[in-house]
């Protein structure tokens, strides 16, 4: 069977659902889906050892020092 024929690969316009974009329930559902996906991508980056920072920021190399190092306002353990 050839899967590259037009009838097998394209959907007719009748199958596409018409969803109102101003529906509050649809907006809430979309926000939950987006938040879940962003969390998934963040966990994936952390697991692979990458950082989500785009440049040196507070606590990063050359930064102002945060909770992990540098001149912070926390206890030094002396």
From Swiss-Prot:
Keywords: Acetylation, Calmodulin-binding, Citrullination, Methylation, Phosphoprotein. The modification Citrulline is found at residue 68. Residues 26-49 form the IQ domain. PROSITE patterns: IQ (PS50096). The modification Phosphoserine is found at residue 36. The modification Omega-N-methylarginine is found at residue 68. Is highly enriched in brain. Accumulates postsynaptically in dendritic spines of neostriatal neurons. The modification N-acetylmethionine is found at residue 1. GO terms for molecular function: calmodulin binding. InterPro entries: IQ_motif_EF-hand-BS. Residues 55-78 have a biased composition (Gly residues). Belongs to the neurogranin family. Signal peptide: none annotated. Neurogranin is intrinsically unstructured; however, upon binding with CaM, The IQ domain adopts a helical conformation. It comes from the Eukaryota. The record marks 38 as: Crucial for interaction with calmodulin. It comes from Bos taurus. Acts as a 'third messenger' substrate of protein kinase C-mediated molecular cascades during synaptic development and remodeling. Binds to calmodulin in the absence of calcium. Residues 38-78 are annotated as: Disordered. This is Neurogranin. The N-terminus is blocked. Residues 50-78 form the Collagen-like domain.
């Amino acid at each position: 069977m050839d899967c590259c024929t037009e009838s097998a690969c394209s959907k007719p316009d009748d199958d596409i659902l018409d969803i109102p974009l101003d529906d509050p329930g649809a907006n809430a559902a979309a926000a939950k889906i987006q938040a879940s996906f962003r969390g998934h991508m963040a966990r994936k980056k952390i697991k692979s050892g990458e950082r989500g920072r785009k440049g040196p920021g507070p606590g990063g190399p050359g930064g102002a020092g945060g909770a992990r190092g540098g001149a912070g306002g926390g206890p030094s353990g002396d």
